[in-house]
Structures are given as structure tokens and as C-alpha cells.
A protein has these predicted regions:
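Residue-level marker for buried hydrophobic side chains located in beta-strands
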Residues: 5, 142-145
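A conserved catalytic-core segment of Leloir-type glycosyltransferases
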Residues: 37-101, 105, 109
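Soluble or luminal CAZymes and related metallo-dependent hydrolases
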Residues: 16, 94-101, 126, 162
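Nucleotide-sugar donor phosphate/pyrophosphate-binding loop at the beta->alpha transition
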Residues: 138-143, 151-163
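A short acidic, amphipathic alpha-helical/loop segment
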Residues: 130-134
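Histidine-centered beta-alpha loop that forms part of the nucleotide-sugar donor binding/catalytic region
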Residues: 8-10, 122-123, 146-149
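Short N-terminal targeting/anchoring amphipathic segment
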Residues: 106-127, 140-143
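N-terminal subdomain of nucleotide-sugar transferases
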Residues: 1-62
């Protein structure tokens, strides 16, 4: 089975979201499936990781490593950070511009191989938007992983509002 994973966080980043998606990819591969990953990277490149083909797509606005270095140097108002914040306020997604580049890459890959399953993971909304755009054009099973999106006390707040 051909599986495509679309996410913002993947190896070599050191985050909780990365560990979860690395595990998905590794265990799918160990089960005998062909795994392709589209994720955010510092440059546009393709690499192999544990038998999985990983396509890194650079965000033209600001890469994750650049943003982390700005935060560590306590630079709050760098032009790229302002542009990233503006994207969020306009589209509710920091990675809206990255989404278009990644979607183009996903379409190109989908034309060359037929994906049976696409797994998109919430880190930014853009990964789900990419999977949705692909799903409108091509038949496959779509798994939208929301992670801990609604693990908070949302129900209790709703009760308080209704009282």
C-alpha cells in the first residue's frame, strides 16, 4: 500500500509532534508499506529516512530553524516574523504560503504514483488543506490526525457559557 504523510514536523526536528509522525512512518514501513512524507525543511530536497522517502519543502517566508534562532536571540520584530504573523491573522495559518509549494509537490508525486492512504497531521492547518485539495482530485482514504486538538476542558467552558 502506498501511504503519503503530509506534516509540518518530521525528522530531524526535535519536537513531540515529530516523534509521533516519525513513529507512524517507521511502523508503516516496517509493516511493508511504501511511505512518502512531505514536510517542511530548511531547503527543498529529497532524502531517505528509515526506508521512507522524505520530501522537504522550504517555507519561502520563514523556516522553523530561522524562527527558532530569532526567538533565541530575542528578536521579536524581524520582517519574516511579522509576515508570518500577518499570514496567521489573515488565514488562521502560519504556513499558508508554504501550503502552495507543498501542494504543488504533493500533486506532482500523486501523478507519478497512486496513493492509497494520505495521513495529514495537525501542526498547522495547511497539512489538512493539502490533503483536502488532493482528495478532491484523486480517490484515496484520508486520515486527518488532529493530535491533542480537543484534549482541553472545552466541554466545561461550554457549560459555563450556557448557564
Amino acid at each position: 500500500m502506498n501511504i503519503l504523510i503530509v506534516c509540518n514536523h518530521f525528522y530531524p526536528h526535535n519536537r513531540i509532534a515529530t516523534f509521533r509522525l516519525n513513529a507512524f512512518a517507521r511502523y508503516f514501513r516496517e509493516a511493508g508499506h511504501s511511505v512518502t512524507v512531505i514536510t517542511e525543511g530548511d531547503r527543498d530536497e529529497t532524502a531517505m529516512w528509515n526506508g521512507c522517502e522524505v520530501h522537504y519543502v522550504k517555507d519561502p517566508v520563514i523556516t522553523s530553524s530561522k524562527q527558532e534562532s530569532l526567538l533565541q536571540r530575542r528578536k521579536k520584530w524581524a520582517f519574516r516574523r511579522i509576515l508570518s504573523a500577518l499570514q496567521f491573522r489573515l488565514f488562521l495559518d502560519y504556513k499558508r504560503i508554504w501550503q502552495f509549494k507543498a501542494c504543488k509537490k504533493a500533486r506532482k508525486l500523486a501523478k507519478s504514483r497512486q496513493f492509497d492512504v494520505v495521513l495529514s497531521s495537525y501542526g498547522h492547518l495547511s497539512s489538512h488543506r493539502i490533503a483536502y485539495r488532493l482528495h478532491r482530485k484523486m480517490p484515496f482514504y484520508w486520515i486527518a490526525d488532529m493530535r491533542d486538538e480537543t484534549s482541553g476542558r472545552t466541554g466545561q467552558r461550554l457549560v459555563l457559557v450556557l448557564k
